Amino acid sequence: MQIIVPHLKSKACHGARGRDRDQQDGQGCFSDRREKAARALVAWASTHPAPASTAGTLITGDLNSYARETPLTIFRNAGFSSLVHHFHPCTDAGCPQTTYRYKGRNGTLDYALASDSLMPLVLGAWSWAINAEEPPALGYRQNASPASPWRSSDHNPVIVDFAL
């Protein structure tokens, strides 16, 4: 499989100018930059030469975009599916699997997106709840003791199980 690991621009507004400023559409700052990056990734993935034996493409990383934001719409329209949401769908009550917490609210900014051709090989996917739920006081930005559990990121990792 072809694996692409992007980290799209943060929603934080430091240094945002022009179209990178918060457009008040719920996507935060730098949404234009994330949209352009998503379009470039889709274009690159569709033209990047891969051996005929390649099963498909996995785009996995911190996309700094919630599921209904423009970058995820671009990936969906290009035939990529969020694996965690495929196996653990959201309901009106919320999403059972999340990767980030901001001001006490859970959400997903990190994804494993599979191309249609890769989907038959995916056995499962989930968010490993080891970071976002932990208080920042137990985090990597403090002097955490390596002898005890500590928050190593502000995001939870996404795990995917494949039948290869």
Go through each PLM region and give its residues.
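Phosphate/oxyanion-binding active-site loops and adjacent basic polyanion-contact surfaces
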Residues: 30-38
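A general, composition-driven signal for non-globular sequence regions
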Residues: 24-28, 144-145
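Active-site metal-binding loops of divalent metal-dependent hydrolases
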Residues: 8, 62-63
